[in-house]
Amino acid sequence: MTTHEQIINYTIKPHGGTLINRVVEGEERDHLLEAAQSYKVITLNPWSISDLELIGIGGFSPLTGFMGVADYTKVVEDTHLENGLVWSIPITLPVTEEEADKLEIGDDIALYGEDGELYGTLKLEEKYTYDKKKEAQNVYGTTDEAHPGVKKVYDKGNVYLAGPIQLINRPKHDEFSDFHLDPAETRQLFHDLGWKTVVGFQTRNPVHRAHEYIQKSALEIVDGLLLNPLVGETKSDDIPANVRMESYQAILKNYFPKDRARLVIYPAAMRYAGPREAILHATVRKNYGCTHFIVGRDHAGVGDYYGTYEAQELISQFEDELDIQILKFEHAFYCEKCGNMATAKTCPHDASEHVHLSGTKVREKLRNGESLPTKFSRPEVAEVLIKGLKQN
């Protein structure tokens, strides 16, 4: 008989060995809902709500709450938690000094969203100030306020609250409900499908021919693909999640074997932290049950802040500790002479034969209602994107 533990560990053990679950249900939830009415209250922005959800469902295992100063300092300075596990991005709960002054260590705090919904609770164990410039420099590699992630750091409250959380209500992802699975559920799915090896693919962009080529190359060596697009907060000029989700369905339906790929949302905010975020993305996909993770060119990058393969170089230093196999791919393109997709590793021809289209150029063309070259994008995908952006 297959036990719950065998299913959870079917492909790979979670980061730290245990899949965290801070979701309260049934009578416990009813009691907590009632008790929370008398708790002190703080309101979380969408970024913090998505972090709360990912802690609660185990996506951020082994974290059981927002980081205290020891973990925070170790992560910022050394890319590890205090217990020695690799962790690359601080998961923190910022508040203003005025809010912090009203709270005392030991307080139970009700965590509300900007929509007025009660999402969870925090047992306050610590409150501490932090150096914004140091966090920006170490995590994002720059103190430039034009960087969207750095700007978020500078705009945050000056105090971090720390302590274990409980997740009472989940953020609603209604339009993506068919694709909303928690790490325990994806692990069950992989067990049911018989996938012993699974490659995770992170994206905040539509999947074009270059991505498809990389995913299919990976599928040659593993049992299944988890297409795991980020649907939390992104930059205003990124293509909206609902449009992207429709495009992912189009490409999977028309160009992938039905028993080899699954689409599941990743309900996180995008930090644009490049190399450091690549490590977080790999860690989270390990928690979702992936044994392999794809890191391509300029992973989680923005503008010209990071080198083309800087994320691959950094994550390579931690690959043994992460215990998930990193598949590093070069920039893929369509080669006119080869007559197919290729990379510099497989194509001998001059760059003049290569068809590249940057994400910026794609967005520009789509917003102008222009069609995308079939060498760059599948027609079914282009059609969804043009229609979706007109509606948005």
From Swiss-Prot:
Residues that span the membrane, as ranges: none
Keyword Transport: no
Signal sequence region: none
Pathway where this protein functions: Sulfur metabolism; hydrogen sulfide biosynthesis; sulfite from sulfate: step 1/3
GO biological process, one term: hydrogen sulfide biosynthetic process
Keyword ATP-binding: yes
Reaction it catalyzes: sulfate + ATP + H(+) = adenosine 5'-phosphosulfate + diphosphate
Domain of life: Bacteria
Top-level EC class as recorded in UniProt: transferase
Keywords linked to the UniProt accession: ATP-binding, Nucleotide-binding, Nucleotidyltransferase, Transferase
GO molecular function terms attached to this record: ATP binding; sulfate adenylyltransferase (ATP) activity
EC number from the UniProt entry: 2.7.7.4
InterPro entries: ATP-Sase_PUA-like_dom (IPR025980), PUA-like_sf (IPR015947), Rossmann-like_a/b/a_fold (IPR014729), SO4_adenylyltransferase_pro (IPR020792), Sulfurylase_cat_dom (IPR024951), Sulphate_adenylyltransferase (IPR002650)
Family named by the database record: Belongs to the sulfate adenylyltransferase family.
Protein name: Sulfate adenylyltransferase
